[in-house]
């Protein structure tokens, strides 16, 4: 797995194993948000034709936030979630990915580099390494 940071308190994790691929971006907030922005990104390299369920991904990320609180007694507030709509199922993998992002933040694990997930009008995934 590759772990990156994003500007504005964000993190990205990319998991590729065999023929599966998952990308998750999370932006954190200093305080609880009234709602979480959920962005399903398109990719020109569509691995699967069926789209992942964004609401299930949101649930998995929020469960990981709860898991982190139980294990480390550290509270996180999520303001934005980014994922690729045609990445590999199942959605349950996003709980693990979110947990790894947050665990890395708690343990102050240094990321590979900084990355920007650009969201344009088409929501096409464009990754820029800084």
Predicted regions and their residues:
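Accessory interaction regions appended to the cores of large information-processing enzymes
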Residues: 1-130
